[in-house]
């Protein structure tokens, strides 16, 4: 397997997927907290 877009040893698509999932998780937690009322202090 030869990936053309590789940063060192980590493929770019893997980095993008992990970053995207982390961003969606943080956003969902923030919006859920603000909806419940816990995130209003943020």
Swiss-Prot record:
It is a single-pass membrane protein. Its main location: plastid. SUPFAM superfamilies: Photosystem II reaction center protein J, PsbJ. InterPro entries: PSII_PsbJ, PSII_PsbJ_sf. The keyword Thylakoid applies. The keyword Transmembrane helix applies. GO terms for cellular component: chloroplast thylakoid membrane; photosystem II reaction center. Keywords: Chloroplast, Membrane, Photosynthesis, Photosystem II, Plastid, Reaction center, Thylakoid, Transmembrane, Transmembrane helix. Gene3D superfamilies: 6.10.250.2070. It is found in: Plastid, Chloroplast thylakoid membrane. GO terms for biological process: photosynthesis. The chain crosses the membrane at residues 10-30. Disulfide bonds: none annotated. One of the components of the core complex of photosystem II (PSII). PSII is a light-driven water:plastoquinone oxidoreductase that uses light energy to abstract electrons from H(2)O, generating O(2) and a proton gradient subsequently used for ATP formation. It consists of a core antenna complex that captures photons, and an electron transfer chain that converts photonic excitation into a charge separation. PSII is composed of 1 copy each of membrane proteins PsbA, PsbB, PsbC, PsbD, PsbE, PsbF, PsbH, PsbI, PsbJ, PsbK, PsbL, PsbM, PsbT, PsbX, PsbY, PsbZ, Psb30/Ycf12, at least 3 peripheral proteins of the oxygen-evolving complex and a large number of cofactors. It forms dimeric complexes. Belongs to the PsbJ family. This is Photosystem II reaction center protein J. It comes from Tupiella akineta (Green alga). The gene is psbJ.
